Each structure stands twice: as structure tokens, then as C-alpha cells.
Amino acid sequence: MPIGVPKVPFRNPGEEDAVWVDVYNRLHRERLLFLGQEVDSEISNQLIGLMVYLSIEDDTKDLYLFINSPGGWVIPGIAIYDTMQFVPPDIHTICMGLAASMGSFLLVGGEITKRLAFPHARVMIHQPASSFYEAQTGEFILEAEELLKLRETVTRVYVQRTGNPLWVVSEDMERDVFMSAIEAQAHGIVDLVAVENSGDLT
């Protein structure tokens, strides 16, 4: 039987009694955001709204985006990425589990020097076509020219944010390339790898 979203107590400043709120609501108040599903328009709009709201609330405190995602739709993913670059606070990205396709695109989009992977996390990059075909299911047909532009956009972001040459990124995106956390660090997708059973970073 599904248990639903867990609830935790939260006390507003100046109030004596705590109220029960869902755990994600509580974590959002601490500026912790979660992408734990495929990227689609709904989760994209939710994350964008949270980033903008929390930036208005305090534009000096960093935000933290935890990612465990198999990928998803390209355009909603790019919308999240652009918002990450637009809002004033630095956004830390943390890969736990898997950051594949659009998940890895958002991972690399975190503030440079503030992108982290857990030690057993996996990262996968590839060209945007496969996730688009999956998302399509007859709803729309993506023109080849538009797909090429999207691929160029995604490739350019990886080049800019990893420091790898264009030919390396283009070659990697020809197929599914899976990486360990250490390999993702060497590839420039993350800057830090968490050390197991320790609060230290390498």
C-alpha cells in the first residue's frame, strides 16, 4: 500500500506549535530541491517556480538541486538549465543514483566548482534524440532541423561547462556513454566526488 509523501513537523518562526508539512515542502524551505523523476513540463515548471521564488526570498543564499533522473524531455530540461543560469544564487548540483541524458545536462549546469556526485552515482550523456523520441509518442513530430539545433545547443553547453574540446563532446554524444562518479569528475561534468562514510570531499 502506498504511504504517500512523508510528513514532518515544522515550526514557523515566532510560533509555539509545529505543523505537519510534507517532507519536500520542509526541505524546500531549506533551499533543497529534488529532481527524482523523468524531466517533463510539470516537474520543470515546479522547479523553475521554486528557484525563482527562493531567489526572490533571498538572492544571496545558495540553492541545492539533488538529481536522480533517467532523463526526459529536452525543452523542459533546457528551461530548467536556463533558469539555473538566470537566478542570482549559486546552484549546487548533486548527483545521487543516476543522472542520465537531461539529468546529466542539469548536473553539468550547476555552479562550476559546486557540482558533486555521490561515490556510487552514475552519469550518462548522449544526443537528445532518443529521449525526444520516447517523449513524443505521436504527440508531435520534431523536425530534423530543430533536432539538429537542439543537439548543437546541448553540445555547446557541455563544451563550455566541462572544458572539453568540441570533438570530444561530439564523439561522446554519438552513443550512450556511462561514467562512474570519478570518471564524471575527470570528464568535467562534476567538480567533486563525495567520500563514502565521511563528510569530506575530494
Curated annotation (Swiss-Prot):
The active site is at residues 101, 126. One of its GO terms (cellular component) is chloroplast stroma. It catalyses: Hydrolysis of proteins to small peptides in the presence of ATP and magnesium. alpha-casein is the usual test substrate. In the absence of ATP, only oligopeptides shorter than five residues are hydrolyzed (such as succinyl-Leu-Tyr-|-NHMec, and Leu-Tyr-Leu-|-Tyr-Trp, in which cleavage of the -Tyr-|-Leu- and -Tyr-|-Trp bonds also occurs). The keyword Zinc does not apply. InterPro entries: ClpP (IPR001907), ClpP/crotonase-like_dom_sf (IPR029045), ClpP/TepA (IPR023562), ClpP_His_AS (IPR033135), ClpP_Ser_AS (IPR018215). One of its GO terms (molecular function) is serine-type endopeptidase activity. The keyword ATP-binding does not apply. Component of the chloroplastic Clp protease core complex. Belongs to the peptidase S14 family. It is found in: Plastid, Chloroplast stroma. It comes from Buxus microphylla. Disulfide bonds: none annotated. It is an enzyme of class 3 (hydrolase). Gene3D superfamilies: 2-enoyl-CoA Hydratase, Chain A, domain 1 (3.90.226.10). One of its GO terms (biological process) is protein quality control for misfolded or incompletely synthesized proteins. Keywords: Chloroplast, Hydrolase, Plastid, Protease, Serine protease. Its EC number is 3.4.21.92. This is ATP-dependent Clp protease proteolytic subunit. The lineage of its organism: Eukaryota, Viridiplantae, Streptophyta, Embryophyta, Tracheophyta. Cleaves peptides in various proteins in a process that requires ATP hydrolysis. Has a chymotrypsin-like activity. Plays a major role in the degradation of misfolded proteins. It comes from the Eukaryota. The gene is clpP.
